[in-house]
Amino acid sequence: MNFDPRKSAIADMSPSFATLVISLMILQGIFMENPDDLAAGIEITPQFERFSQRNDVFSRAFWDDTVRSAASQAFFASYRMETIPRRGDGFTQKDFALRNASWLISDIMTDRFAADGRREGFQAPISNDTPVAVEKVRFETPSDAAANVKKAARFFGADLCGVTGLDQRWLYEDRVDVRDMSKAPLGLPEGLTHVVVLGHEMDQELVRSYPSALGGAATGREYSHEAAIVMQLAAYIRNLGYQAVASMNDTGLVIPMAVQAGLGEYARNQMVITPKFGPRLRFSKIFTDMPLEADRPKRPGVAKFCDICTKCADACPVKALPLGPPKFGGGRSAIQGVKKWTSDAEKCFSFWTKLSSDCAICMRVCPFNRDFRSWPQRLWLKLALSPARGLALWFDRWRQGRLKPAQWWSRP
């Protein structure tokens, strides 16, 4: 069910009166969670608020003096101009050169309408270059339609594809006009009913080199890949006669959408752990009115493993990840009214600015960061998702550690 804005008024009531009102709303069928919330591991309160993208830490770096600094400005500039290389391994000129080149296709797409205030793919949905066909291609069933879209997604290069109904709780309250960082309407068309969520695997060897500018090339490459893939798949759906809006980090929170689409389970490091690639993915999405059969969320046991594992939090240099159980709350850059593991976004981003590159140590050290194509790793996964998860955590001590960037360059 879509988020009902009437719930926000409950936050201002006394606890006893709020309980009475909620009880009446439940009897009237007004206050209802999405039926799949339990299966997805999503728990919300009446204090739930849709997230304003203006409060995203990357947006705040342009208008909020508690985040904006000379270091943050240098961080963003380093992706678009010649940076001052360091002597340290992983931060040489060739490391930054590879990282910046990996972002090229994404940057070209993002810059197309920046002069109009639309930083597409990050702070605005991607504009459509393909008109919707007048005649619709009809499929016998929504299941057939979903299978067709997934086939096309694999052809274009997506590593994972799932479908979920459009849950408006995860849409941003507004987008950002990058000309002055003011709030702007999302601009989604009416009638959208489903979200096609795509997963894009990051290079495992480069991820092993984090923290480094070289490791940042793994992120940039997938943003460039996903920009092409999500635009191509959206064009295909529009050619079939249905609305399709391509989206990357913009427009809505893709993590809960990926969970609802059955692609994986939410983890302590705030990532989606997938059965094929662990946390080593980027996600994109397409909003559409195409009648599709939605996938069901799955909870194989990742959260239970995270309950006993704190490797990501322990490894974080600035201690931005939580050690305790999931809880409500969080800072300005966190969605409110959702019980989950939440990072300190300000601490995390401050470390990025010190590196002049992104950091994914929490991804690298995650025990699920493995190549599950091999049978020993698949066996470990079964153990990790079983009541013997503690034994799997003990075995993780023998997993490969960090790869020195110089080693990556020296390999054939």
Where are these regions (language model features)?
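Charged, compositionally biased interaction regions
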Residues: R378-L379, A384-F395, G401
